[in-house]
C-alpha cells in the first residue's frame, strides 16, 4: 500500500489491532480550525451532528455508493473525513465463520472513514464518533463477503482528510495483491 507521503500516520504506534463497535479508537483527521492533520480518540458508531437525542442505532459502516446522497453521511463526507489505521479486519463468511483479512507482511494500512461531532443534550458534552466506509469486495474477498472497507493508498492519505469536498475516486475496491484471508477459525474437537 506503499508511499511515504503521510509521516504522521505511518509513524504512529496507535494502530487498531482489534476494535469493536462503540469502542474508542485512534483516528487521523483534519482539524477543522487549523486544517492540520491530527490524531484523536473517536468512538466507533456514527452519531450525526443534527440529532437531538442519542440514537439507538449508530452505524459503523457507510456505503461508498450512497454516501453523498444519505443525509446521515453526506455532511461528514464533504467536511469530516478520517483514516483508521489497522492491521486487519474481520468478516464473517457464508458459514458464519470469522475470517481475518490483513497484509501478508502484517503491516498496518489506512481505511477511509467519516467522523462527526455531536453534543449530548443530557450532559452538554461533545462526543466525536466515526464510521468506516465500505466498497464492493475485491476478487480475493468476494468469496468471503460482498463488502470490504475502503483501503487507501498511503499516497492518498493527505488528500482524503484534506479540504477537497468530493474525493470519491479514492473509494474503490483495493486490488488486494498484498492482502491475505485467514482460514476460518474453527473449534478443535477432540475425541477420546
Predicted regions and their residues:
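Short linear sequence motif anchored by a di-proline
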Residues: 1-192
